[in-house]
Amino acid sequence: MSKQPSLSYKDAGVDIDAGEALVERIKSVAKRTARPEVMGGLGGFGALCEIPAGYKQPVLVSGTDGVGTKLRLALNLNKHDTIGIDLVAMCVNDLVVCGAEPLFFLDYYATGKLNVDTAAQVVTGIGAGCELSGCSLVGGETAEMPGMYEGEDYDLAGFCVGVVEKAEIIDGSKVAAGDALLALPSSGPHSNGYSLIRKIIEVSGADIENTQLDGKPLTDLLMAPTRIYVKPLLKLIKDTGAVKAMAHITGGGLLDNIPRVLPKGAQAIVDVASWQRPAVFDWLQEKGNVDETEMHRVLNCGVGMVICVAQEHVETALNVLREAGEQPWVIGQIATAPEGAAQVELKNLKAH
């Protein structure tokens, strides 16, 4: 008889009971997000979802994303309640730019050692994000992987599927010189540029947990969840039919994201003086001595979404967005791009 002790999965660092406890805790979160098209609850091998009624030629739109190294800041600050909102926002905001209504969302949560309380906070945030975007949380994967992650550190990924009527896909092909560009404000850096943000904090030696800007803790400003624009934008599309293109301003800022939805030969002229940049961006620029163009190439600088409409629809679009609770403004317009010119020109850049 071998004297070798009997090994279990728990001895190897995987706690099946903890995983099951987490599933029980998050079932109610998923239930709150349920859409009528979703068939069944959590726990099956696959999630089933019907196409909503009323579509003649439905086209499915998919997207996947993470939250970048904002997650490292969340871990350092032990703040896990809103990072799930960020995860959903990064996916659903990408879907809505082509006119798609988000249908369902799945998440992937990988960790070295599963902390049920932390994971439940994260998934509760994911549920909140799904509710804000009218999307169902239909499943996910929680992977406890000892030896792959340090202690209770975790990584997150999200996956979302939406639907749009084929004839109503918004692809930027109708954008023309003279069109107006509208902007919607961000809540802060959203989920991009955090490797630079963390480097600025490190190099400057700033005590972010004891710093306030405009009477608000800096940590709250840096961790403010990414805004979810789905419902106001779907209302704008439905009520006006005027949207020609939309750009979700993520990694790469205005300079890299607006060109993704512009046809060849079009140039966006953006007036940087058209909005007051939130104080958190000025703080980051000052502490990191960051060049002005670099700021706009890495961070959203206060702009979360850009919308293109014809000039005759500007006032209607602004009013619909205001009625939906947004604070839109005209940020620029479309011009014919000069030969060899960049597709985005930033006007009135402040001297650094």
From Swiss-Prot:
NCBIfam families: purM
Gene this chain is encoded by: purM
Pfam families: AIRS, AIRS_C
Domain of life: Bacteria
Annotated protein name in UniProt: Phosphoribosylformylglycinamidine cyclo-ligase
Pathway: Purine metabolism; IMP biosynthesis via de novo pathway; 5-amino-1-(5-phospho-D-ribosyl)imidazole from N(2)-formyl-N(1)-(5-phospho-D-ribosyl)glycinamide: step 2/2
Principal subcellular localization: cytoplasm
Matching Gene3D superfamilies: PurM-like C-terminal domain, PurM-like, N-terminal domain
Transmembrane segments: none
GO CC annotations on file: cytosol
Enzyme class name: ligase
Family, per entry: Belongs to the AIR synthase family.
EC code: 6.3.3.1
Keyword NAD: no
Swiss-Prot/TrEMBL keywords: ATP-binding, Cytoplasm, Ligase, Nucleotide-binding, Purine biosynthesis
Cellular localization per UniProt: Cytoplasm
GO molecular function, one term: ATP binding
Any single GO BP term: 'de novo' IMP biosynthetic process
Catalytic function, reaction form: 2-formamido-N(1)-(5-O-phospho-beta-D-ribosyl)acetamidine + ATP = 5-amino-1-(5-phospho-beta-D-ribosyl)imidazole + ADP + phosphate + H(+)
